[in-house]
């Protein structure tokens, strides 16, 4: 349905890492722009992805515009994917690649999403706004890669899941147990 509203030759930014998107039949009037976290066959891909204490760094390889070193002040590979999607949309609509990368490097998290606070030798990552299964999985994956000696996590409720609530919370518990946490703590009404 999104494609139906796009004019002839419009860029359509798609995740190359999603096998279902790659297999989808796209209308001839759109121009797909593929991004990937690993596959250099995509139009734009991220290489040498590293999680650092204050964000992510990676090499952005754009088949049209060249190669750039990028650092974003956001944690997790999912945010690298978000940055690639934003880069693809902006550059294919005519923005200067260097300006887009500068904008990405100045990105600020909103609300209570992956806010990093350093105090007295302890790093706290607050990521509690509107928790849902995907955001919690991304937070645990990011947390697992974070450079530190011991990891503690306080995990709260994921609301508004209806009949899927128990199953989603149990899955989150399994992921937390497998994530290398020193001490997972959970608070839920279940």
Regions found by a protein language model. Name each.
Residues 1-123, 148-149, 174-177, 181-183:
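Acidic, Mg2+-coordinating active-site environments of NTP-dependent enzymes
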Residues 15, 126, 152-157:
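Short beta-strands and strand-loop turn motifs
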Residues 80-83, 133-137:
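Amphipathic alpha-helical transducer elements in NTP-driven molecular machines
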Residues 112, 129-136:
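Glycine-rich phosphate/pyrophosphate-binding beta-alpha loops
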Residues 131-132, 159-163:
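Short, small-residue-enriched loops and turns at beta-alpha junctions
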Residues 137-140, 165-175:
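Charged helix-capping and loop-helix junction motifs
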Residues 143-151:
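Glycine-rich phosphate/diphosphate-binding loops that line cofactor/substrate pockets in enzymes
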Residues 188-189:
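Conserved small/polar residues in nucleotide/adenosyl-binding loops
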């Amino acid at each position: 349905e999104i494609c139906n509203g796009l004019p002839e030759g419009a860029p359509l930014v798609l995740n190359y890492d999603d096998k279902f998107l790659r297999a989808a039949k796209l209308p001839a009037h759109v121009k797909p722009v593929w991004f990937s976290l690993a596959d250099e066959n995509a139009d734009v891909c991220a290489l040498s992805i590293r999680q650092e204490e204050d964000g992510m760094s990676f090499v952005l390889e754009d088949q049209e515009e060249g190669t750039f070193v990028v650092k974003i002040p956001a944690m997790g590979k999912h945010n690298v994917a978000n940055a690639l999607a934003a880069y693809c949309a902006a550059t294919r609509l005519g923005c200067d690649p260097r300006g887009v990368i500068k904008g990405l490097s100045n990105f600020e998290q909103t609300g209570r999403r992956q806010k990093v606070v350093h105090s007295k030798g302890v790093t706290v990552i607050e990521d509690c706004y509107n928790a849902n299964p995907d955001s919690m999985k991304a937070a645990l994956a990011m947390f697992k890669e974070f450079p530190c000696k011991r990891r503690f996590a306080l995990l709260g409720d994921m609301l508004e899941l209806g009949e899927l609530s128990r199953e989603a919370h149990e899955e989150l518990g399994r992921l937390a147990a497998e994530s290398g946490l020193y001490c997972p703590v959970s608070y839920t009404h279940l």
